[in-house]
From Swiss-Prot:
Domain of life: Bacteria
Gene behind the chain: higB-2
InterPro entries for the chain: HigB-2 (IPR009387)
Keyword terms: Toxin-antitoxin system
Name of protein: Toxin HigB-2
Pfam family, one: RelE
Induction: Induced by amino acid starvation and the protein synthesis inhibitor chloramphenicol.
Note: HigB-2/HigA-2 has been shown to stabilize plasmids very efficiently in E.coli. Three hours of ectopic expression of higB-2 results in bacteriostasis without any detectable loss of viability.
Its biological purpose: Toxic component of a type II toxin-antitoxin (TA) system. Inhibits translation by cleavage of mRNA.
Length: 110
């Protein structure tokens, strides 16, 4: 079944800093095989955080991607990407902002 990857402007802006084109393709293939990889972020309505290897670093020291999977449409909404060394977890305000952004985006796409 075909999947669609929708990138936020933030994800699009920073992706090249963290992932090579090949690493990005591998990440997409991994998500298509197992769309619910990563941990659900509590209090966000289903957003997930996944560890990815980035630019020669392993998954543990690599990057984190926040995404949402809309199952009925096989859409992956890629919201943001950041290095593990930059931030460990999202704070309450960031979670709230991402959830609001995702809700608006999802309503726009339906």
């Amino acid at each position: 079944m075909k999947s669609v990857f929708v990138e936020s402007t933030i994800f699009e802006k920073y992706r090249d800093e963290y992932l090579s084109d090949e690493e990005y393709r591998l990440f997409q293939a991994e998500l298509m095989l197992n769309p619910k990889l990563g941990d659900v972020i509590q209090g966000t309505g289903g957003l997930r955080k996944i560890r990815v290897a980035s630019k020669g670093k392993g998954k543990r020291g690599g990057s984190r991607i926040i995404y949402y999977f809309l199952d009925e449409k096989r859409r992956f909404y890629l919201l943001t990407i950041y290095g593990k060394n930059e931030m460990s977890d999202l704070n309450a305000n960031q979670r709230k902002q991402l959830m609001a952004f995702m809700e608006a985006w999802r309503n726009e796409q339906s």
